[in-house]
Amino acid sequence: MPPGGGGPMKDCEYSQISTHSSSPMESPHKKKKIAARRKWEVFPGRNKFFCNGRIMMARQTGVFYLTLILILVTSGLFFAFDCRYLAEKITPAIPVVGGILFFFVMGTLLRTSFSDPGVLPRATPDEAADLERQIDIANGTSSGGYRPPPRTKEVVINGQTVKLKYCFTCKIFRPPRASHCSLCDNCVEQFDHHCPWVGNCVGKRNYRFFYMFILSLSFLTVFIFAFVITHVIHRSQQKGFLDALKDSPASVLEAVICFFSVWSIIGLSGFHTYLISSNQTTNEDIKGSWSNKRGKENYNPYSYGNIFTNCCVALCGPISPSLIDRRGYVQPDTPQPAAPSNGITMYGATQSQSDMCDQDQCIQSTKFVLQAAATPLLQSEPSLTSEELHMPGKPGLGTPCASLTLGQPTPPSSMPNLATEATLSDIMPLKDEHGGHQFLTPDEAPSPPRMLGAGSPLAHSRTMHMLGLASQDSLHEDSVRGLVKLSSV
């Protein structure tokens, strides 16, 4: 293209009206920037979250801090007043072993307290409504104060029938071995118990860490208690018992704390060792779900029949992922901005379609084919004879793309006046069906009002549509017949 011819085209392209810009007919939607909220901020349970949702604990954490204080104070006194003397007089391995036990105890305690125990997500309102509907259909509608039977399901696990209870708070059927914690207000998978000493529920995802914590804590307590007594006895042999107590008063406090706590810790460790070896939970053992007192037919369907296998599954099996997305973002319901309705886009689309014949594009819509076939007839109508009007196969119609000239035609003198004779009953739409195609008049194309010039093709077609067509029935019939033949070819 020559350089001179590219200028007007570029000016035309740059002067196009943007359909996305605001206009007086539109009210632009002003979006307010709202800070995205994490899902832990709207979590329905009674839990506390720290570090942006990474740490999850129960709401009652007072006893947990007491546990931390007891462990830190006892271990700190031991390392400060006893380990130095024991390392010099007996062996330097004592503080090393004590340090390893201390860090292992603290690590397992924090992992138990800060992790998700296996909380089950609650049902959404749609899921809850659908589940309630299914339950009502299964139980039947209640009337006259009649309460339907308990909402339970029965499943068979290793030949044993297990009931699944419906949780009215979470609106779900709890899976096997799950239970609802009244303190945390959550359904926990493979629920064992709620432990205030660790400040969290004990369930499927943190049970192994809880067991390692109480087991290592029992070893640490016995270790500290034993070497505190050794320290006092060793000093009493040199200076006497009272002088030994005066030289190391912290040893007395350590011995008292360890003496009163070691029995409960060792007992708890032994009890959970039994539960792990039989693949049971504290909740199942308290309820006696698989007790032999109910008969030989009542056996534990979750046990592998081997103590070693049960321990390996509980302590070395894979940890299931968390089912709640604590750190995900809450999706806000943002309104979608409405599409512009000022007619500019529709007009631009109509104008681009009207230029198809000028670009020698033979793929056209039916309204442009009709316009190409009808316009030459109306322009040459004064020179046609009565015989030529009744010739449906006359080749004077021409082809749409080759002979279509959208000029301003002169209406024939035989046309009636619009102001006096045209009525709505005189308007006959040019519609016909042939081969599954429907041919529409040019005026049926959507176009915005008050935006077409007097000399445009669409304005011309609208003017010709308003002419009185009652006296030109034969002319329109010939136009339709010719158009049908063109489309069939």
UniProtKB/Swiss-Prot annotation:
The protein, known as: Palmitoyltransferase ZDHHC14
Gene responsible for this protein: Zdhhc14
Molecular function via GO: protein-cysteine S-palmitoyltransferase activity
Phosphoserine carried by residues: S456
Main location: endoplasmic reticulum
Cytoplasmic side: 1-60, 111-208, 277-489
Organism listed in the record: Mus musculus (Mouse)
Record-annotated active site: C195 (s-palmitoyl cysteine intermediate)
GO biological process terms held by the UniProt record: peptidyl-L-cysteine S-palmitoylation
Family matches, as Pfam families: DHHC
Catalytic reaction annotation: L-cysteinyl-[protein] + hexadecanoyl-CoA = S-hexadecanoyl-L-cysteinyl-[protein] + CoA
Keywords: Acyltransferase, Endoplasmic reticulum, Golgi apparatus, Lipoprotein, Membrane, Palmitate, Phosphoprotein, Transferase, Transmembrane, Transmembrane helix
Family to which the UniProt record says this protein belongs: Belongs to the DHHC palmitoyltransferase family. ERF2/ZDHHC9 subfamily.
InterPro entries: Palmitoyltrfase_DHHC, PFA4/ZDH16/20/ERF2-like
Annotated GO CC locations: endoplasmic reticulum membrane; Golgi membrane
EC nos: 2.3.1.225
Membrane topology field: Multi-pass membrane protein
Sequence segments annotated as region (Disordered): 434-454
Function: Palmitoyltransferase that could catalyze the addition of palmitate onto various protein substrates. May have a palmitoyltransferase activity toward the beta-2 adrenergic receptor/ADRB2 and thereby regulate G protein-coupled receptor signaling. May play a role in cell differentiation and apoptosis.
The DHHC domain, residue ranges: 165-215
Domain comment as written in the entry: The DHHC domain is required for palmitoyltransferase activity.
